[in-house]
Amino acid sequence: MKTLLLTLLVVTIVCLDLGYTLECHNQQSSQTPTTKTCSGETNCYKKWWSDHRGTIIERGCGCPKVKPGVNLNCCTTDRCNN
């Protein structure tokens, strides 16, 4: 019985990947590329829009709501928002 419980515990830990944290790019379009560890988040985002300065790109953790005219791409793997 103890062996069965231990086996189930190991399988659960391996399958759930406990402690995993997502890593996302988090720079603005004009900044040097950087990444951030996103505790508690399951998404990275990249949003972009155009104005008098040209195309503006913003990256970060989460998946925010955006205003009309702002493009948004949300994704779920490490550094997927490049």
From Swiss-Prot:
Disulfide bonds join 24-44, 38-61, 63-74, 75-80. GO terms for cellular component: extracellular region. It is found in: Secreted. The keyword Translocase does not apply. Residues 1-21 form the signal peptide. Keywords: Acetylcholine receptor inhibiting toxin, Disulfide bond, Ion channel impairing toxin, Neurotoxin, Postsynaptic neurotoxin, Secreted, Signal, Toxin. InterPro entries: Snake_3FTx (IPR003571), Snake_toxin-like_sf (IPR045860), Snake_toxin_con_site (IPR018354), Toxin_cobra-type (IPR054131). Pfam families: Toxin_cobra-type. GO terms for molecular function: acetylcholine receptor inhibitor activity; ion channel regulator activity; toxin activity. The keyword Disulfide bond applies. Belongs to the three-finger toxin family. Short-chain subfamily. Type I alpha-neurotoxin sub-subfamily. Binds to muscle nicotinic acetylcholine receptor (nAChR) and inhibit acetylcholine from binding to the receptor, thereby impairing neuromuscular transmission. Produces peripheral paralysis by blocking neuromuscular transmission at the postsynaptic site. Has a lower toxicity than cobrotoxin. This is Cobrotoxin-b.
